[in-house]
């Protein structure tokens, strides 16, 4: 294997090792709202993430999260019925879902878009959104409460734990966590064959070199 080929193999390995991903840092929180109503979610983050973009996304795929709306600085952004606004002074950002439909129910992530060269994954918090028929009531709990159909500015704000890099001590099984496990296993399966191939290539290159050196060290009498 030439030096150029070896460099190509090494670069490929590094690219696989640096593939950015998303990893849940706490067990999911739940919030509920009525069909046709609205709800708001407030996600907190660390001081070091104050100047970074914040996003709200839905994770239907394995290696990527479809961002629904993302901040650009402190200015608010809107995408259809979903809006987001960052409050750097409070180290939090608020996501508002309006005119809820049954299709809005599911798992979402609120997270911080970190530079992938500095951080290998974006810190996120999982949020489970439930939508119930209008006119019905649900019992509120520490991890869930009802939205309202009033203006967004009067909505109760649901505050989740800070978006940090500390793992929750007691994570609970959830589809979002299963996505992360699948991503991790997929990355391992992609990297392992490459590393084994690189190791085999190194051993194969070194084998003829040792053989040629041993021939050079044979006594001259044996060649005659």
From Swiss-Prot:
One GO molecular-function entry: transmembrane signaling receptor activity
A GO cellular component entry from the record: plasma membrane
Gene3D superfamilies: Immunoglobulins (2.60.40.10)
Chief location: membrane
Residues modified by glycosylation: 90, 99
Topology in membrane: Single-pass type I membrane protein
Extracellular side: 21-183
Biological process (GO), any one: immune system process
Location within or outside the cell: Cell membrane
Annotated signal peptide: 1-20
CDD domains: IgV_pIgR_like (cd05716)
Entry similarity comment: Belongs to the CD300 family.
Protein name (record): CMRF35-like molecule 6
Organism: Homo sapiens (Human)
Gene that encodes the chain: CD300C
């Amino acid at each position: 294997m030439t030096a150029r080929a070896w460099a190509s193999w090494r670069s490929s390995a590094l690219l696989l090792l640096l593939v950015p991903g998303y990893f849940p840092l706490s067990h999911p929180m739940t919030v509920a709202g009525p069909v046709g109503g609205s709800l708001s979610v407030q996600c907190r983050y660390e001081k070091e993430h104050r100047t970074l973009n914040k996003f709200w996304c839905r994770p239907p795929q394995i290696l990527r999260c479809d961002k629904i709306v993302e901040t650009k600085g402190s200015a608010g952004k809107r995408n259809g019925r979903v809006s987001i606004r960052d409050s750097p002074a409070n180290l939090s950002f608020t996501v508002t879902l309006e005119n809820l439909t049954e299709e809005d129910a599911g798992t979402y992530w609120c997270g911080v878009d970190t530079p992938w060269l500095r951080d290998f994954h974006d810190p996120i918090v999982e949020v489970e959104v439930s939508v119930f028929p209008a006119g019905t009531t649900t019992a509120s709990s520490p991890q869930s409460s009802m939205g309202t159909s009033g203006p967004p500015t009067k909505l109760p704000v649901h505050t989740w734990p800070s978006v940090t890099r500390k793992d929750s001590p007691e994570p609970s099984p959830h589809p979002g966590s299963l996505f992360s496990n699948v991503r991790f296993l997929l990355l391992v399966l992609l990297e392992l064959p490459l590393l084994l191939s690189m190791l085999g290539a190194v051993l194969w290159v070194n084998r003829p070199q040792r053989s040629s050196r041993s021939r050079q060290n044979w006594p001259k009498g044996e060649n005659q």
